[in-house]
């Protein structure tokens, strides 16, 4: 088990042995979105870990989960509105002389994402992806491209094996660009962008973190605007802001 204590480490591309942090991992007790009248405030949290199979083989298995908890919705017993489950496996290709400023590394993988709900709220998709990335000093540029594995759209609407969301890429596009930059005094800004030029839809997200209480914790500001913040509402434009704490960034 490894938690990066270096304040300038990027968890996504860190090559720690065994179990380690992966994507942003945070707890945001206070978030606000005007998209959900009567339930504007939700607790948003994510968990994300990866496991390297062997020190000499850069094969990783990873699991990420993002949850939306309506902690203030007492009239409905404070439900979890949505959980998104995201297991994946990927192989990391890195040049031997990775210290050179011009080097590119690449992740090649397969991932599944679903929300575990029953019809008509079930959402899921599977993707093959390639993600070249450039990392030098205090900058990381990670550009992920994917191909969705086709599902059967001809099955009846009540069949759970039917494609739940055949148009999801109209809202997510086929690529995501992530840029992370270390700033002064170990502050960090992380932004991500998705866009489909055919439909004109996409999203932009931002996470700003500063060193917080204790080693490995960071005060966090979160902002998102666009589509597919969650699978359930992939086709609804959402604007959300939130504050909390992170352990991976």
What are these regions (language model features)?
Residues 43, 47, 53, 57, ...:
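Extended aliphatic helical segments
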Residues 1-79, 84-87:
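Outer-membrane beta-barrel initiation region
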Residues 39, 54-185, 193-199, 219-227, ...:
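Outer-membrane pore/translocation modules
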Residues 201-249:
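Predominantly the C-terminal beta-signal and adjacent terminal strand-loop region
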Residues 47-49, 87-94, 205-208:
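Short, well-ordered amphipathic alpha-helices
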